[in-house]
Amino acid sequence: MLGLENTKYEVKGTSKFKKQLKKVVKLGKDINKLIEVLNVLASGETLDEKYRNHNLINNKYYKDCSECHIEPDWLLIYKYNNNEIILFLIETGSHSDLFN
C-alpha cells in the first residue's frame, strides 16, 4: 500500500480510510508525509514526538486505536493487530472530519 518500504507489519486500510485518503489527495495534502509516518509505524518503530502520537482512550468507536498528527489538522487513526502482524489504518482527515 502506498509504496511502503520493507516493513514488519502488513498494512491494511479500511474502506473508510481509503475513501478519506482520496479526499485528502483532492485537498492537495502531501501524501509523502503520510508515507513517511506509515513507514515508521509499519516497521514497528516509535514515531518522533512532533507527530503527537497517543492512544485514544474513553472512546468506544476507536477502541484500542492510536492517533498521530501528520500535520496540525491532518490526523491518522490506526491500530496494530500483533497476532496477525497487521497495521490497520482506520481513518484519516481533519479533527472535525473525524470527531464531529
How should each PLM-predicted stretch be described?
Residues 1-5, 37, 60-65:
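Short, charged low-complexity linear motifs
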Residues 1-7, 19, 26, 31-32, ...:
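Enriched for short, Lys/Arg-rich terminal
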Residues 7-13:
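Short structural boundary motif marking the start of a folded domain
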Residues 13, 52, 91-94:
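A secondary-structure boundary/capping signal
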Residues 13-40, 46-48:
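N-terminal first-folded block
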Residues 16, 58-61, 94:
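Residues that form or immediately flank small-molecule/cofactor binding pockets and catalytic motifs
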Residues 38-41, 56, 87-89:
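Generic leucine side-chain signal with a strong bias for well-ordered alpha-helical environments
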Residues 42-69:
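A short, surface-exposed loop/turn module that caps and links secondary-structure elements
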